[in-house]
């Protein structure tokens, strides 16, 4: 009997933000962490949504089967070589061709007292594509 698949194909992260500055040796950033427990590679597509501008799409990553990938949002570039701007609130949509589990982490080093926040993304269900 086949093992049930863990996760979902569509996830959302409503609160994301890249601080514009860092203090010390640690750079402020956000990471979207993907876990693929399935037998096939996960082709992961990300889109960023903003309060006052059109979405940025075309971001892509691959998570091999039985592995995890930590996608640094500050280093992510889409198919047009665009990055997500700093100091602007945004949300993320994360879609995959197979079920995955998604967690989101923020390291804020704008002050010497570092802040680390992590949360599970919301499993929104099946991808339409």
Regions found by a protein language model. Give the residues of each.
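Gly/Pro-rich, tryptophan- and cysteine-flecked surface segments typical
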Residues: 1-129
């Amino acid at each position: 009997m086949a093992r049930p698949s863990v996760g979902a194909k569509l996830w959302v992260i409503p609160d994301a933000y890249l601080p514009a500055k860092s203090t010390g040796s640690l750079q402020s950033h956000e990471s979207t962490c993907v876990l693929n427990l399935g037998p096939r590679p996960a082709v992961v597509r990300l889109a960023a949504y903003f309060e006052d501008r059109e979405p940025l799409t075309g971001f892509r990553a691959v998570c091999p089967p039985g592995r995890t990938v930590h996608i640094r949002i500050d280093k992510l570039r889409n198919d047009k070589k665009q990055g997500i701007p700093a100091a602007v609130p945004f949300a993320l949509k994360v879609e995959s061709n197979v079920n995955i589990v998604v967690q989101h982490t923020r390291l804020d080093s704008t002050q010497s007292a570092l802040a680390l926040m992590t949360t599970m993304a919301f499993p929104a269900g099946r991808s339409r594509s």
